Amino acid sequence: MVNMIINPASKSGHGLEMWKELETCLIRENTDYKAFLSEGPGDVTRIVHELCENELSRNSSSVLRIIVLGGDGTFNETLQGITDFDRVEIGYIPTGSSNDLARDLGIKGEDSSLLSGILACREPFLMDLGCLTYHDSAEEHSRLHEETVSDTRYFAVSCGIGYDAAICEEALASHFKNTLNRLGLGKLTYLTIALKQLILTKRGNCTITLDGKEPFELKSFLFIATMIHRFEGGGFMFCPDADAQDGRFNLCAVGPIAKLRILFALPSALKGQHYRYPHIYPYDGASVHIEADRPFWVHTDGEVSRKSSSITIECLQKKIHLLK
């Protein structure tokens, strides 16, 4: 049995059409399946949690197979609902606007071919899982936060605090984004919001602690991206050395660089060449603790729930069982 999780709003609203084509493939191959369509924020998490509760409790040795049809955000919501990562196998057919997970894993091609590969896979790719913990009470929630905001969140690609998360928060609530996505101009949304947030985002000071060692200060920081994979934000290679199986994060920390210089540094990040600019620092660690002097937006795989001034991020090595 395979459980299909579909975001019908993905692919500029064509997710449902894509599912209908894939459903034809499943029927043709006589594949036993169930289909679940999400209807709004938090719905995928609820569906996956119920599947885990119902299916995994019946048999202590059973394995739940899930195939996600959506973007990085849909995959992220799926992770929040999983109760036992050792007994859940996930396939992924990317239909989002960023697709950073698929970009780094080389998942590309016809949807029907991807589906066939997932169904035939018997040796999952074991991939690191990130776990974010908020340590302070939420003072400000995002405009599209779920009804219940947990103090912990999982992620597969990256977790960011500051400027990158502020872009995500505005993009998630942007009606302008939905319009441009339908016109095939989704990238223009992020460019517009990125320029706006570059002007509006206020910097702060923070301390960073890696693997429990001596904390160090980063003054006037713009953002800190903690990454499992190389890409974030639709193709920016912020961490070119990131390895999704090594049990460690790679960090891109942007300090007191002039905002005008950021306009030159960001395009260079598309090829991972941004560290030649001053005040952009690479770090790594299996555990990251950040204490900021005030709350900043925080994202996990582009999903934003709340602001925070105190977070811990831990890497759980090879916890995700990915079918591909």
Give the ranges of each region predicted by the language model.
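A residue-level signal for conserved active-site and pocket-lining positions in enzyme catalytic cores
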Residues: 7, 44, 130, 167, ...
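Catalytic core of DAGKc-family lipid kinases
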Residues: 3, 84-220
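Glycine-rich beta-strand-to-loop/alpha-helix junction loops that act as flexible
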Residues: 8, 69-71, 93-96
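ATP/NTP phosphate-donor binding region
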Residues: 1-66, 76, 80-81, 113-115, ...
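Glycine-rich phosphate/pyrophosphate-binding beta-alpha loops
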Residues: 160, 164, 223-239
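Short glycine-/acidic-enriched loop or helix-start segments at secondary-structure transitions
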Residues: 15, 77-79, 102-104, 166, ...
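Short, solvent-exposed amphipathic alpha-helical segments in soluble enzyme
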Residues: 19-22, 52, 83, 172-175, ...
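ATP/nucleoside-binding phosphotransfer catalytic cores, i.e., glycine-rich phosphate-binding loops
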Residues: 15, 210-218, 237-324
